[in-house]
Structures are given as structure tokens and as C-alpha cells.
Amino acid sequence: METTQNFNEVVTRLKRKDIRRRVAVVSPHDKSTIEAVKRASEDGFIEAVMINDDNLQAAAEQAVTMVQQGTADMIMKGLIPSEILLKAILRYNGGLLPEGHLLTHTACAHIPQHPKLLFYTDAAVIPFPTHEQRIQQVQYMTDLCHAMGIKTPKIALIHCSEEVDERHFPYTAGYTEIVERAKHGEFGQCVVDGPLDLKTSCSAESLKVKGIASPIAGDADVLIFPNIEAGNVFHKTITLFNNAKLASILLGTRVPVVLTSRADTTDTKYYSLAVAAALSGTEK
């Protein structure tokens, strides 16, 4: 399979596997979290453990302990401030972030006008990724796409144009190195190109008009943004103006973490659980 068109396909594959991933749900006191967990449980791809401790720090630490003891495969944020949960994930009893790993946010979107799911990073965690961090992002996104059934993901390194500009945008020189490393198979089976702008990443017609040749061919599966501002604006624009359906998780930790906002819908939290469940068990 080379594409995943929508979240329903993700859920269908999970149902076929008939494996329930154990989810530690921290402070499940909001309606959308409860409904998403109930729906995912009824669909048969998660088994939820609700951590209801009124002491939020203790609740977060309990979730971390469950992962460390092998009794939870995933963590989900409920009605708890992100900073409390992240502090436990990063620090409690050694935390869940292996040495040398990068904590990064990734999202997956089903945009009505777009023919397949689109993955992107980072819209919430890393303000200005370093070159080394971006290399890890490429690896994480490759692994995630493989877990989602995309054999050879096409990964676009996003910029405002297709020109390398070391003076004003030094990260574009790093893009060139990442592309070369991908060609030599460093990230596994994937295709990486950049710099590309958003349109040439996702539109073959735009590539044709600009006269640009790219192995991605205007058919990107993954967008890697240069900074959090670009990623966050894209994240909010597609929901506000395009009615996109979203999933959001954290990568880099020992297990997937569903870290949605309190304002996110039941659907977003349900789809996030589905993506996390698809990834669970494949972490390196």
C-alpha cells in the first residue's frame, strides 16, 4: 500500500489486526476524551486504563510507571495541563525519552480537497529545529509512515521557495545534505526532497508550471516545516478554512503519546488514538 486515503482506512486495518493497545488515560475528566476512548474501545483497538487521581502530578507519574512496568502501550492526555504531563514523561523515574531521542510533535490531516492523509511536523514542540533534530524528524516520519502502511513515504522539506539560500535561510543548506543522506538509504525506504514550497510539495501542476523536477512529483506524504511558526500556522489554517480532520501525537518517547488540546474535538482525539495504536509496538 502506497497511500492511506483517510482515517477510516487506519481504523479498518486496526480492526483487522484484532490487537488492543493498552492506553493510560491521564485525568479523563472531559467529555471529548471520554467519548473518544469509549469509541476506540468499542471499535476494539484500545483497552483503556483511566487514571483519575485528583493529584495531577501523581496521575501523570502513574502513567509513566505503567509504561515502565510494561502495563501500558500508550499514554493519552485528558484534562491535565500539558506541562505537568510532559514533566513526568521527561523526568519521572528516568522518564520515557531514551537518551539521544528527540521529543517532537507530529500531526496527520485528512483535508477534504486532498486525496490522501498528509503528515507534518513540528507544529507544537520544537521552536527552531536544528539540523540534527531535523534529521531525526525525517527518520521518525519515515517510521511512522511505514507503520501506517505507506511503504515509500515521500517527504518534503518545506521552504518558501525551491532555492537554497545559505545567507538568509541557512537551514536550506542542511536540506541538501538530508536529501543526499536519504538517497544513500540512511533513513530506510523513503524519498526526500527539498527545499520545496507547499504547492510544489503537494501539487504536480505547480511543479509543471515552475518547470521543476522532483522525485516527490507534487505528491508528498510528509511535510517537514522549518520552524514551529510555519507548522502551527498550517495546522490551524487547514482546520479553520478547510475543515480538516486531524490526529496529533508525540514521537520520540518509548511509547506514543496522544497530546491533544482541551479544545480538540472527540473526532480529533479518536483519530489520534488510532494513529498512536497503529504506531504502538513499532518504536525503535
Segments from the language model and where they lie:
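Anion-binding alpha/beta catalytic cores of soluble intermediary-metabolism enzymes, centered on
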Residues: M1-I216, D221-K284
